[in-house]
Amino acid sequence: MSAAETNQVQESLEKLNLDSSSSPAAGGATTATTTNNAESSDATSSSVPADSAEEQGESSGIAENSASLYVGELNPSVNEATLFEIFSPIGQVASIRVCRDAVSKKSLGYAYVNYHKLEDGEKAIEELNYTPVEGRPCRIMWSQRDPSARRSGDGNIFIKNLHPAIDNKALHDTFSAFGKILSVKVATDDLGQSKCFGFVHYETEEAAQAAIESVNGMLLNDREVYVGKHVSKKDRESKLEEMKANYTNIYVKNIDLAYTEKEFEELFAPFGKITSIYLEKDAEGKSKGFGFVNFEEHEAAAKAVEELNDKEINGQKIYVGRAQKKRERTEELKKQYEAVRLEKLSKYQGVNLFVKNLDEQIDSEKLEEEFKPFGTITSSKVMVDDAGKSKGFGFVCFSTPEEATKAITEMNQRMVNGKPLYVALAQRKDVRRSQLEQQIQARNQMRMQNAAAAGGLPGQFMPPMFYGQQGFFPPNGRGNAPFPGPNPQMMMRGRGQPFPEQWPRPGPNGQPVPVYGMPPQFQDFNGQNMRPQQQQQQQQQQQQQQQQQRGYYPNRPAGGNVPAKDLAALIANAPLEAQKRILGEELYQRIVATGKAQEPEAAGKITGMMLGLENQEILDLLDDEELFNNHFEEALNAFEEYKNSEGANAATGAPAPSEEA
């Protein structure tokens, strides 16, 4: 299209959209945007082949002086301008609306086109139906506003065992000889490949009956097709139990691969008259080891199942049972799995313990020895990785809940191999995460409500003093003088990489350059001779005492990010007043490492909010990356809302909320 033609199309569409609110299909299109994509290809879930309730939305029917058309099977990239180019040559278009998802605004794959004249609508169906639109043949039919008419099965037939090459147009051409067709649809998968079944909806019941009588059992593209009256999913499910009780079709598997179809039939012939038999084969004509046998009477099928199931034939036990559809079989397997899962949960409820922070030297046998004094242990296991190395946690299962409770009371926080154990009742990961998220969310909401009432966010966490390290610049906490030189975040090393300690380097005049955060006595360095060993030891002791006063411990790796299992031990050995600072340092560095809270104020505020949790909850956050990210995002959003409200108050001249929580 030229630029002038494109502008002309856009102007025409804008003019149409001005009147779209009064057009017959406008209301339907608007309502349809709130629905899910209705182009469902599930034959068993649609009472009509192509114009299901979801697919049609609330579009209007044919008005007295206008025609509303449904256009389906559209490529998601098709928009109103594309459809206008195709439908406008037929006649004057009243409105066009591509139905979109209310949230994502993505096309649902169908649209409504309204003409001013009924004749134009009829002409569009005749000339444009199955016309390729951006690589996909579109499907056009009259829009039906009445949902009862859409869901009616009158005139609706079902066709199965279609050749994959048969599409909507081919099916329409085949069945149009028996009467006026309202809609045709061949079911397809997500890739657009035929599922080998489809539907044809006639205007009258007589035309549908004529098609069933004429085409059922005929060959279409060398395939014998089945044609019958469409039965809705609801009606089929209501008759399912009756079908189970009177089945005639049986499924056989684990058949000897050398078995021929003739031998297969001879195996089942003694039980009654067989109407059809099928042995599945591969592309080379070799048996796949399973097949189906359909008897004329239910009694014959039941007798074959009773006598041949688990019977050994040619050294193999065959399975013989009632043939099931995939959906029914899947549902039964889900029920069996759920029953086993619930039984397992009830069996181990209150007796299975989760133990973490285990030393790497503790294996399953050692774990059982530690817990043996508290009762009878039915099983114990330390979880290991692919290399056989302990993951630092395991499970111990007792015979009674009383024994498990006693073990929790005695062993939780007990030091084993220099580490405090965490012992609690075992929970599924999804349940544990859900509970923890609910607890943290509730506390965050309470903290934010209290902060709002007090006029500000929770107190800011002041980042720790960073001791002199090569190539490292500390982040500027609020209230500190800006640190000169490169951006601190640009200079930060990777997580968990310690920095070698460094003495102050001499300045231009031979005087030592002060190192940020280093005690003054360590800065008296002439750059030539080290101090005597005794004086160095004394200074190291002084430095260690100052570090401990600030909540810093020498057994903690430089650079932070202590593994969670070691951090728990560090917390247990630290004074009560220093525990929050240790956790705060870990949280602060983790928050800065995300790259989303580069401002020191933001990192400090978010750290302060997350420090309001219990120590164990903070350890869980640091141990679970996904859980940490979820709660970090919540805190970040809360901080941004606070900053936005503060900015709005400043713009309007209103006093900003106090930051002193």
From Swiss-Prot:
<dbReference type="Pfam" id="PF00076">
    <property type="entry name" value="RRM_1"/>
</dbReference>
<dbReference type="GO" id="GO:1990841">
    <property type="term" value="F:promoter-specific chromatin binding"/>
</dbReference>
<dbReference type="GO" id="GO:0010494">
    <property type="term" value="C:cytoplasmic stress granule"/>
</dbReference>
<comment type="function">
    <text>Binds the poly(A) tail of mRNA. Appears to be an important mediator of the multiple roles of the poly(A) tail in mRNA biogenesis, stability and translation. In the nucleus, involved in both mRNA cleavage and polyadenylation. Is also required for efficient mRNA export to the cytoplasm. Acts in concert with a poly(A)-specific nuclease (PAN) to affect poly(A) tail shortening, which may occur concomitantly with either nucleocytoplasmic mRNA transport or translational initiation.</text>
</comment>
<dbReference type="GO" id="GO:0000289">
    <property type="term" value="P:nuclear-transcribed mRNA poly(A) tail shortening"/>
</dbReference>
<dbReference type="InterPro" id="IPR034364">
    <property type="entry name" value="PABP_RRM1"/>
</dbReference>
<feature type="domain" description="RRM 1">
    <location>
        <begin position="67"/>
        <end position="145"/>
    </location>
</feature>
<keyword id="KW-0509">mRNA transport</keyword>
<dbReference type="GO" id="GO:0140693">
    <property type="term" value="F:molecular condensate scaffold activity"/>
</dbReference>
<dbReference type="GO" id="GO:0008143">
    <property type="term" value="F:poly(A) binding"/>
</dbReference>
<feature type="compositionally biased region" description="Polar residues">
    <location>
        <begin position="1"/>
        <end position="11"/>
    </location>
</feature>
<dbReference type="InterPro" id="IPR045305">
    <property type="entry name" value="RRM2_I_PABPs"/>
</dbReference>
<dbReference type="GO" id="GO:0051028">
    <property type="term" value="P:mRNA transport"/>
</dbReference>
<feature type="region of interest" description="Disordered">
    <location>
        <begin position="1"/>
        <end position="61"/>
    </location>
</feature>
<feature type="domain" description="RRM 3">
    <location>
        <begin position="248"/>
        <end position="325"/>
    </location>
</feature>
<dbReference type="GO" id="GO:0005840">
    <property type="term" value="C:ribosome"/>
</dbReference>
<dbReference type="GO" id="GO:0071014">
    <property type="term" value="C:post-mRNA release spliceosomal complex"/>
</dbReference>
<dbReference type="GO" id="GO:0031124">
    <property type="term" value="P:mRNA 3'-end processing"/>
</dbReference>
<feature type="domain" description="PABC">
    <location>
        <begin position="563"/>
        <end position="644"/>
    </location>
</feature>
<keyword id="KW-0813">Transport</keyword>
<dbReference type="GO" id="GO:0060211">
    <property type="term" value="P:regulation of nuclear-transcribed mRNA poly(A) tail shortening"/>
</dbReference>
<keyword id="KW-0810">Translation regulation</keyword>
<feature type="region of interest" description="Disordered">
    <location>
        <begin position="473"/>
        <end position="563"/>
    </location>
</feature>
<dbReference type="InterPro" id="IPR000504">
    <property type="entry name" value="RRM_dom"/>
</dbReference>
<dbReference type="InterPro" id="IPR003954">
    <property type="entry name" value="RRM_dom_euk"/>
</dbReference>
<keyword id="KW-0694">RNA-binding</keyword>
<dbReference type="InterPro" id="IPR036053">
    <property type="entry name" value="PABP-dom"/>
</dbReference>
<comment type="similarity">
    <text>Belongs to the polyadenylate-binding protein type-1 family.</text>
</comment>
<protein>
    <recommendedName>
        <fullName>Polyadenylate-binding protein, cytoplasmic and nuclear</fullName>
    </recommendedName>
</protein>
<feature type="compositionally biased region" description="Pro residues">
    <location>
        <begin position="501"/>
        <end position="511"/>
    </location>
</feature>
<keyword id="KW-0963">Cytoplasm</keyword>
<dbReference type="Pfam" id="PF00658">
    <property type="entry name" value="MLLE"/>
</dbReference>
<keyword id="KW-0507">mRNA processing</keyword>
<keyword id="KW-0677">Repeat</keyword>
<dbReference type="GO" id="GO:0006446">
    <property type="term" value="P:regulation of translational initiation"/>
</dbReference>
<dbReference type="InterPro" id="IPR035979">
    <property type="entry name" value="RBD_domain_sf"/>
</dbReference>
<feature type="domain" description="RRM 2">
    <location>
        <begin position="155"/>
        <end position="232"/>
    </location>
</feature>
<keyword id="KW-0539">Nucleus</keyword>
<dbReference type="GO" id="GO:0008428">
    <property type="term" value="F:ribonuclease inhibitor activity"/>
</dbReference>
<feature type="domain" description="RRM 4">
    <location>
        <begin position="351"/>
        <end position="428"/>
    </location>
</feature>
<feature type="compositionally biased region" description="Low complexity">
    <location>
        <begin position="533"/>
        <end position="549"/>
    </location>
</feature>
<feature type="compositionally biased region" description="Low complexity">
    <location>
        <begin position="20"/>
        <end position="51"/>
    </location>
</feature>
